Amino acid sequence: EQPVTVEFEPVESEYPITIPFEAGVGVEREIKLSDIADSVQYVPLETNDKCLIDFINSGKVVKTGKYWFVSSNTRLYQYTTDGKFVRNIGSRGGGPGQFNYFQQIDVNEDTGLIFMLTTSGKINVYEMETGKFLYDIKIPDKETAQFAMLNDTLVATFMLNSSGQQKE
């Protein structure tokens, strides 16, 4: 069974939508943990040779109803909600379903899909229950820094203006 590469044609619509982030800059307020949570639970993660986590990138932990997904730039670890190691998702390399580095993940519990934004201009898609690579989605701009899947084919992205010259 061969992996599939999916390329989507842009759809004419009212997109892109510009969100005025500058309006929120400088508007800070202190929030107590008790304002947003009733309790705190510590979950010790299983440690063995397959799941030695060297570091966790900021904002790179995702919890679903059944799993925790913990990521560094080079590995995505899957754990049960009680901390038992399940598997690593994907692997480093240049083949189908592989990556050199990845920036972020998103998970759709309803469809059981894991979406991984790689640094090579694509989003790898894996099956949550098996870790199997299914297909990848090419993204038009390699400068994409963050993303969210709106459905299985529609992606919202945030692109860095690293040169300071880009207007759109």
Segments from the language model and where they lie:
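Residue-level detector of Asp-centered blade-edge/turn motifs that repeat once per structural unit
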Residues: 63-65, 107-111, 149-152
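Conserved beta-propeller blade signature
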Residues: 67-70, 113-115, 154-156
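Blade-loop segments of beta-propeller domains
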Residues: 46-53, 57, 79, 84-112, ...
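Glycine-rich, histidine-containing beta strand-loop boundary motifs that form or position
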Residues: 72-73, 89, 118, 159
